[in-house]
Swiss-Prot record:
It comes from Salinibacter ruber (strain DSM 13855 / M31). F-type ATPases have 2 components, CF(1) - the catalytic core - and CF(0) - the membrane proton channel. CF(1) has five subunits: alpha(3), beta(3), gamma(1), delta(1), epsilon(1). CF(0) has three main subunits: a, b and c. Its main location: membrane. Residues 99-116, 123-134 have a biased composition (Basic and acidic residues). This is ATP synthase epsilon chain.
Amino acid sequence: MADELTVDIVTPDERSFQGPANGVRAPGIEGSFEVREDHAPMIAAFGIGPLIVKTQAAHEYADMHNDRIIFATSGGFLEVIDNKVTVLAETVEPASEIDVERAESAEERAKRRLEEGVQEEERETHEAARDRARNRLRVAMGKVGTRQS
């Protein structure tokens, strides 16, 4: 058995995290799921929600207990092969770097547009914007447990 996972989180723009971890929890399309050492190989899609990396050591993005890093993510894919977890995400943002005022403004803007009435084809876009903003706020305010809330 391996002692740890190696986690690599990348977006189209950058590598957001690379390092050892005890586990990764992702907001799966059909519900959250967790990957730990010696997990079977898999590829899974995930959606808007918190992405939690359970770290083995202090990290600049770690929460106050230095045992996990919480990212707000807007979806992507996660691959597990031989204790290596690769997360290919549309966006990820560590909780410590989320601009709360900007997220609140984005949520209000999306809610206002939905209340004003939009064409059906625009509704999904505004609902997704609202959901992304709400996720960013939850992550920034620490309203995320070890299990997806």
